[in-house]
Every structure is written in structure tokens, then in C-alpha cells.
Amino acid sequence: MQKTAPRPLPARISFLSASVLGLGAAVASRGAVFVSNILLAHSLTVHDFGLFSYAYVTALNLGLFLATGVSQAAGHVLPLIENPERKRTQLCAFIVLLMALIAVAAAALYLSSASISVAAFGSEQGSGALRMAAIVLIATAFTQALQSFQYAMHEHRSSATISIGAAVLLLTMLWAMGPIRQPALALTIFLAVNAGAAVSQLLVLARATPSQRGPWRTGREELRLAVKHALPSVLTTSMGAPVHWICLSMLAAMTDGAHQLALFSVAFQWYIAITFIPATLGNLALPFLARHAGATETTVRQRFRSALLFGGGLSLALGCASFLLAGEIFAWFYPAEYGSAASSMRSLSVAAALCGVSVLLQQRIAAAGKFWRNFAMAAVYSVIYVAASYLALRLGFGATSIGLAMSAAYCCLILFQTLTLQGDSGAAIRLGRSFS
């Protein structure tokens, strides 16, 4: 039987083209989630929206730190591998590692949902939503990581197509279902959309890595390499999303915890809208920076400076705009019950502007292979974040406490990151050619 010719590898595109495609996809996906939360804030009661937000943020944060950690390691390793067969087996190793980590996290959340609900709300009122969130976690984490894998494999166009399609599907389902009255139903819709996107991404990656032995085979050496690079990266991201969830749990433990969570959640959507641009640029920039192994420091600096000026500058501009317009935004887009969330939005606007700079500095350090240094700085950030959140909550700042704590922690983190990069300014990026 005649064998089908393997699909040619996608041509490498410029960083500008990759940025345009990545940002377009991010605008579509984040925009859909953003609009969805506004719709749910109108259809759900404030209490139920608080339960939904806590459950969804739990799934998103626990899944996000695993997805970001593994995909950051993949974005560092895969662009350095020239052999297509070896690149395919290494990609499979990262996918296997991701599946194992997600399975453990989802099982832990599902089994402990009642305990978490009691700790957060004083009763099991949120346990059902948290159990659904454990299933949502699997799909959301997979979708986030597989998108970064597509970037590392130069499948930017396919990634953009899937993201835009998922965004359209999410809004269509919410419109077709009419007003949503139950948090579990809203979580089910998010689950269906993310699951469909994950399946589509797997099919694209399978086509992008053809092999005579099948698309999903790997080896012990590839798994060892995946664990070696993913471990410090996952530990670093564990200092972010799970720590943020801990701070939200402290907020939920207040007397009116569900109400405070609802106020914070509607404001936090604007934080995400501001920070997704530098986050997307960071995911796109890492493979490009890593691919310049052995390049002059001047070349790498120029590429990094372009991403920093655009992503960080835009975050600063959007942060200032949202800070000044917070009152008007909540008067225009949300029911009157959410008016007091404007103060939370102002504190989060400051944090978002700082985050836009920090995330790009983190990727610059990761591109140099210094994952453990990122972990050390992230650990310091986490301690400051939790301590500041606890202090602000004790002082009675309510939902505004999280934004204030994040701002303080990001200020310290940016200082440490800047000192780290200045200390290495005289050396070229050395990633080695052991992957070639």
C-alpha cells in the first residue's frame, strides 16, 4: 500500500506575524469570557455569581499553574530541537507529563470539594460547583497548555482559528440557552467549549508531527528531559495561581464572603483584560528568544525590548485608563449591586499595569534557562502577596485587599527581576546546543 507523504513542517513566521495572530486569538477568547461574565453577572444573583466565580477561578488557577509551568518548559526546549522525529517524541513527553499532573490536581479538587467549601463559606453550599470545577479544570488546563505547544511548533494560524472558533461557540451557547440561573449550568457550558477546543488542538498537533510509529509515542529519555525542565517551571507558577486562590479563600471566609467574591470577580475580569496582552506576548516571545541560542546579547536584547515596550507600555496605558474610568464602567455595564466594586477595580488596575511588565521580565529570564531563579523570586512574591492580603483583610479593606496586596507583591518582584537581568547584562544568552 502506498504511504502518504508526511505533512511538511510549517514555515517559521516572523515574530510580528506571530504576535498579530496570537493577540487576535487572545482578544477573541478573553473577550468572549469577559462578555460571558458580564452576562452571568446580570442573570445570576450576586450570591450565586460569587459561588460560580469561586468555582471557576479555582479550576482556572489550579489548572493554569500546571499548564503554564509545563508549556513554559516546552517553549524553552522544543524550538531548540531540529530533528522532527525527536521534536515529536519530546512534545509527546510534555503532553504525557501534563496529563498526569492535571489528573492528580482534578482528583484532589473533586475529593476535597466539601472540605474546601466548608473552609471558604462555612458550609457545603459551594461543594457542587467545586466538583464541577474539578472537571472544568481538566479542559481549561489542557486548552491553555496545548495553545502554547502550538506556538512552539509554529502552528500560530491553527491556534488562532481554534481560539476564535471557541469564542464564537461560547457566546452562541450562552445566547441560545437564555438567562443562566444556576452556577453549575454556567460551568457546564465553559466545560463543553474548552473540551472541544482541546480536542481540536490535539488533532492539529497530531497533523503537525507525523510519524511512522504513530503521533503519540515517546520515550524514557524524553520524559526525563520534560520533568527536568518542567519541575522548576511548575514550582515557579505554583507560587502564582494557587497562592492567588489561597488569598481568594481568605476573602471568601469573611462574613459576607460570597458577596465580596462577586465584587472582586467582576473587577478581576478587567484585570485579565489588561494583562492578557503581555501574557500572550510572553508565550509568543519565549520560543523566539530561546531559538536564538548563541546569538549576540544585542540581538536578544532588541527582540526583548520590542516586546517589553509594546506589551508593558500597553498594560500601563490600559491600567491608567481603567483606574480613572472605574466608576463609569460599573455604572454602564453592571447592575447597581456591583457599584462598590469600583474600588477593587482601581487597586487591580495598578496591579495589572505592574503585572504587564513583570510577566515579560519573567519570560526573558526563562528564555535564558534560569527557571530556578524565577522560582526563588516567585516564592518571595508569594510570601509578600499572602501576608499583604491577610493584613489588608484584617484592616477591613474587603474585596479591595487582593488588588492592594498584588500591587505590593509585583513592585517587589519587578525590583528583583530587574536586578537579576542587570547582573547578567554582560553575558550572552547561553542555552546550549545539546537539543540539536
Curated annotation (Swiss-Prot):
Bilayer-spanning residue ranges: 20-40, 49-69, 91-111, 133-153, 160-180, 185-205, 234-254, 261-281, 307-327, 341-361, 375-395, 396-416
Highest taxon of the lineage: Bacteria
A cellular component annotation (GO) from this entry: plasma membrane
Descriptive protein name: EPS I polysaccharide export inner membrane protein EpsE
Record keywords: Cell inner membrane, Cell membrane, Membrane, Polysaccharide transport, Sugar transport, Transmembrane, Transmembrane helix, Transport, Virulence
Keyword Transmembrane: yes
Similarity comment: To E.coli bicyclomycin resistance protein (BCR).
Predominant cellular place of this UniProt entry's protein: membrane
Gene that produces this protein: epsE
Bilayer topology annotation: Multi-pass membrane protein
Places the protein is found: Cell inner membrane
Tagged with keyword DNA repair: no
